[in-house]
Amino acid sequence: MQLADAEKWMKEFYEKRGWTEYGPFIRVGFLMEEAGELARAVRAYEIGRDRPDEKESSRAEQKQELIEEMGDVIGNIAILADMYGVSLEDVMKAHQEKLTKRFEHA
């Protein structure tokens, strides 16, 4: 899936459910929640959870969980960017330019 297609799909999906009605401060809160879930998935994949109250998952299930949580983070970033009239392509271009400039003499 191309980045622009993914953005379009996410925006339509979120709008259909009324999820775009939340303002930027609430959206950032959701982003932080998803970042925490991604951190949990990374931990499970890298060092395990060591929780007797949780079912141990296979490596494939852990990787799928990583992918899904990354998608949740990207989805929230895409919706937040859209609130400010910015595309993910704009975000990535600015990020690339910032890092290139910052480290051009390193």
Curated annotation (Swiss-Prot):
InterPro entries: MazG-like_dom, MazG-related_YvdC, YpjD/YvdC. It comes from the Bacteria. CDD domains: NTP-PPase. The gene is yvdC. It comes from Bacillus subtilis (strain 168). This is Uncharacterized protein YvdC. PANTHER family: IG HYPOTHETICAL 16995, NUCLEOTIDE PYROPHOSPHOHYDROLASE.
